[in-house]
Amino acid sequence: MPPPPEDEAIAHKGHFYGVYLLCSQSLDSRYRAKCYVGFTVNPKRRIKQHNRGCDFGGAKKTSKKGPWQMVMIVHGFPNNISALQFEWAWQQPTLSTRLKIFPDLKRKKPKETHFDYNFRILNRMLGVGPWHRLALTIRWLETDYERAFDLPIPCHMEIVSGKVSISASQRKLEEATGTAPPVAWAHECHLCMQSIEQPERSRLGCTNPTCRLTCHMLCLASYLLGDEPGQYIPIGGECPLCETRLSWSALLQRKRLQLGVPEEMQDNEEEDLSDDGPDVDSDVEVQEFSD
């Protein structure tokens, strides 16, 4: 299989959760420019499913109303539940308790396109909890649709352009992220000085490969939240040992990759359009959690 283009990012299978926006390119005026919001763990595969129809895993709402373009995707969610909650709120802004404070989201403005309306909803969502605390990436997949947000988004979020490729290959992961030397862990937490039990589950370290920071996950979270009383999920901060700037989402992603990928998910590069795994049809009802 040829390597991905230089502007194409590589995400590791089992660690990618995205919420995407489709726009119809149908020649039928009833469907052209209509939009659809969905969840995926594999963007390339998902758009193929939508364009091939229900029999190949596409959604009922998109069947025979395309062809569709996946114009943007939001990713960086810590898990599929968080992404599904985001998807549901983006689909249902009038029902989401977090978005009811924005009465202007109840309907499209006069002459506003379906894309502009969905983009306006997204802009509002990125500024409210719990999503404004997440280190999300807003990725443009089609340059024709790129535009700036009217309202500023949190500075720890990233806006990028280019496709994303999902790979189960350990070789590709190492090529994309670099092969780091084995971590020399301490047996005690550097912050509370207590022994770290069940280290595979509760231990975190620094992203600086030369730093030997070893902490309980909760201890490091509390340390990084020192200047933010009342919050539960840190955004980032300085390493208590080497003062490297840390991103909480990057720490968790690094830990997941250190735990490895299940054997059944490795080295399987063939696409199966009839089975999209954890991807969920947007007709599924998702309960919105309260703070």
Curated annotation (Swiss-Prot):
It is an enzyme of class 3 (hydrolase). A zinc finger (SLX1-type) spans 189-242. It is found in: Nucleus. Keywords: DNA damage, DNA recombination, DNA repair, Endonuclease, Hydrolase, Metal-binding, Nuclease, Nucleus, Zinc, Zinc-finger. One of its GO terms (biological process) is double-strand break repair via homologous recombination. Its cofactor is a divalent metal cation. Residues 15-101 form the GIY-YIG domain. PANTHER family: STRUCTURE-SPECIFIC ENDONUCLEASE SUBUNIT SLX1. Belongs to the SLX1 family. Catalytic subunit of a heterodimeric structure-specific endonuclease that resolves DNA secondary structures generated during DNA repair and recombination. Has endonuclease activity towards branched DNA substrates, introducing single-strand cuts in duplex DNA close to junctions with ss-DNA. This is Structure-specific endonuclease subunit SLX1 homolog. It comes from Drosophila persimilis. The lineage of its organism: Eukaryota, Metazoa, Ecdysozoa, Arthropoda, Hexapoda. The gene is slx1.
